[in-house]
């Protein structure tokens, strides 16, 4: 368990931060950009959880824990199999959940406008932020070694959040399609 007696360390005042291997990197480095985007995704999911309960809340809480682990994987340069927290089984779980949720939804006939119920709107925002996290992880992977399961997980997560948003709108009987009245 982590115990912090002080929140500030002053070690980042020069524009650098520490990674878990004790190395220092600039706060604008691709690795820190990716970690920050993952943190933003988790925070957006936390806001969405204000409108959830039961299984949906538990699912989103588990995803937040996964994102914490994903950020921890990103904070470790290199790739050691014993060190990885995000593994293919988590990607497969997201896929199963996507398939299960999608079974109860009507087929898509147009693009979906973000919005609808408050929960759906928050899930769409989390989805868009997760796409930013994905782009940041892809950029990092272009420069350094990244656990391939991280890319798979964050890619599936945006799909998962999209399907959850559709389900939230269906349950709230409030769906928005991208069909303009002409």
Residue ranges of model-derived segments:
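Phosphate/pyrophosphate-binding loop motifs in nucleotide- or prenyl diphosphate-using proteins
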Residues: 1-182
